[in-house]
Amino acid sequence: MAENAGNAAIFCDLAGTLVRMDETRQLPLDARGNVIVELLPGVAEKLSPLRDHLIFVITNQAGIKRGRLTRKSVEAAIAELDRKLGDILSGWEICPHDDADQCACRKPKGGMIAELAQTFGVDLTSSLMVGDQEVDEQAARAAGVGRFVYAKDFFGWK
């Protein structure tokens, strides 16, 4: 693992942190089944000035396993998010599994964070995770991320 490689990073959850979720806490879809990417308030304003940092998206998407989404549609949504943010993302990890799979990548486990840290030489103890749920905080802790901040506090939501 690359905990001491020297590069701090910002890890962000996707739905409910960077983009809007639907009423079932899933990524919203249009009539053709494409993910609707609607930035949440303050996201672009807060993240765009941080473009000199490594910024990653990590997301649980059990809808892939269940057939509601495809990996390609989630990747397209993250690419659209990146365009809306001004091409600031360094990378992303998607967990397509559900809880029954007991995989190492699904939050609250830290596998997605650890994978990105190893690939990009991230110093996890100097890094930050932003998320909207307790599983995000647990994943940050499991991976050894130095600081966790809830999205409402990071982006200044009421």
What is each PLM-predicted segment?
Residues 1-56:
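Active-site neighborhood of HAD-like aspartate-dependent phosphohydrolases
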Residues 60-74:
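A short secondary-structure junction motif
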Residues 57-60, 128-130:
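Acidic beta-strand-to-loop metal/phosphate-binding motif
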Residues 2-10, 49-51, 72-75, 79-91, ...:
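Asp-based, Mg2+/Mn2+-dependent phosphohydrolase catalytic module
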Residues 27-30, 64-68, 98-103:
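A short acidic, helix-capping loop that chelates divalent metal ions and anchors anionic groups
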